[in-house]
Amino acid sequence: MMAVHGIKHLVLLGLGRAHIQVLRGLADIRPADLHLTVIAPRPQALMSPMVPGFVAGHYTLAQCQMPLDGLLERSGAHFVAGSVAAIDAHAQRVTLASGDTVAWDWLGFAARWLHVVT
């Protein structure tokens, strides 16, 4: 989905700290001219301060993960469970490992995705 009648499509790849902040901000304002899609393996985030405790055996991996279903709903995001296989910057399209594609007007992604940009 690209811009239709003034509506822009923002696609966020992953649920890291920066994207969680974006979702929090959008949950407060819910712009009518924005369609939001989040692509990540699961609707949860790893709480990085707990990783040392996980490595030391004090926490399970499940205890280190924060569910984000509520935040996704409040922000109006459409959640897509998947991983990215390619980002075509020229065509403004993300291809998922499943073969599905998602078009975007604006794209948010972490540096770890640079290896799939064409």
Positions of PLM-derived features:
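FAD-binding core/adjacent interface of flavoenzyme oxidoreductases
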Residues: 1-7, 76-118
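Beta1-alpha1 glycine-rich phosphate/pyrophosphate-binding loop at the start
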Residues: 2-78
